[in-house]
Amino acid sequence: MNQFVEALISQEKSNLIPDEYDYWKDLIGSWSLDYVEGYGTPNERHVRGEWHFARILEGLGIQDIFICPARSERIDTRQGEYGTTIRMYNPAKKQWDMVYTCLENMSRFVGTKENGRVVLTNIHNKRNRWVFTDISKDKFHWQNETDMKDGTLKIWCEVFGTRQ
């Protein structure tokens, strides 16, 4: 297994990724999460989670592992979500090609930067986005949002991350 990890994980970004497209550099590492559904409603729910990011494949990609609830809080393995995203920089398109998978789900996204936000647009439903904002060395904010047909913005869930 060590050879697999050594071949997968990279310590540095590839020179093929321009600095201005290295959107994930401040997320590399491990994070504690406050996952929030129904923010500001009577059904508001908070779950503690964890999120880990690493450079992969000679620095050409970024992979994460999203675990919610956190491993220390899980009652059984079917509870919550345990998934991974693989992001590969596409120099021809100057964007990130991405896939997220977890049990019974596989979603593809395109990652770009818009107005200081890292926006991951679902390629099968362009009204749905995953958005990273307020990324710093110690914290970040993420939300799953959809432009609804009636013109409103629906925020399905949010994550507030703090570095471990």
Where are these regions (language model features)?
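Hydrophobic small-molecule pocket/channel-lining residues, especially in calycin-type beta-barrels
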Residues: 1-164
